[in-house]
């Protein structure tokens, strides 16, 4: 059975151990968290503070992890954008909000979401609309439009893009659409 104190799950609170023990404990906590899922520097900092690790130990551990490339918010942000855009169809706005929520700084967020082109974003939104249209055939047009607009809004797409794509895809199905675009009021 592994020693729980050695891996940072139990043991004395942060302030009562020797600095070397605190460093080893913080390192073990970070490594355990990182084996489950990638984390940002801010997420690791929060986790260590909850375990009463002193700030100077946190900085030392995370600086070292940054030097060797174990913790890199820019790499995390790029991977997050690629994964969440491909998997969930999230738009740049929603992706940026998720990254900010995870403690990624604004410049890194901007760089990561700028890697997603407007053409990619539109193509993904169009795929989402087509998939949802197929699932809502037979329902009244108003219901379909409302569901499509809500889905795109929840994923962070602008109202202008959403209206345009919904209109184009419904017209491609031969459905007469008569709803104002956001620009028309």
From Swiss-Prot:
PANTHER family: REGULATORY PROTEIN RECX FAMILY PROTEIN. The lineage of its organism: Bacteria, Bacillati, Actinomycetota, Actinomycetes, Streptosporangiales. This is Regulatory protein RecX. It comes from the Bacteria. The keyword Isomerase does not apply. Pfam families: RecX_HTH1 (PF21982), RecX_HTH2 (PF02631), RecX_HTH3 (PF21981). Keywords: Cytoplasm. InterPro entries: RecX_HTH_1st (IPR053926), RecX_HTH_2nd (IPR053924), RecX_HTH_3rd (IPR053925), Regulatory_RecX (IPR003783), WH-like_DNA-bd_sf (IPR036388). The gene is recX. GO terms for biological process: regulation of DNA repair. Belongs to the RecX family. It is found in: Cytoplasm. Coiled coil: none annotated. Gene3D superfamilies: Winged helix-like DNA-binding domain superfamily/Winged helix DNA-binding domain. Its main location: cytoplasm. GO terms for cellular component: cytoplasm. Modulates RecA activity. The keyword Membrane does not apply.
């Amino acid at each position: 059975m592994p020693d729980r104190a050695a891996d940072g799950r139990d043991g004395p609170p942060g302030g009562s151990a020797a600095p070397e023990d605190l460093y080893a404990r913080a390192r073990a906590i970070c490594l355990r968290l990182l084996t489950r899922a990638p984390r940002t520097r801010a997420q690791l900092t929060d986790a260590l503070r909850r375990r009463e690790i002193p700030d100077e130990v946190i900085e030392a551990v995370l600086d070292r992890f940054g030097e060797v490339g174990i913790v890199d918010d820019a790499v995390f942000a790029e991977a997050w954008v690629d994964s969440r855009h491909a998997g969930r169809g999230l738009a740049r706005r929603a992706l940026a909000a998720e990254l900010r929520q995870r403690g990624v700084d604004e410049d890194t967020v901007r760089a990561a979401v700028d890697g997603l082109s407007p053409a990619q974003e539109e193509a993904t939104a169009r795929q989402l609309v087509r998939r949802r249209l197929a699932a809502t055939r037979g329902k009244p047009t108003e219901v379909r439009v409302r569901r499509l607009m809500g889905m795109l809004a929840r994923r962070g797409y602008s109202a202008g893009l959403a209206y345009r794509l919904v209109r184009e895809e419904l017209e491609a199905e031969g459905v007469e659409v008569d709803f104002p675009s956001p620009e028309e009021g």
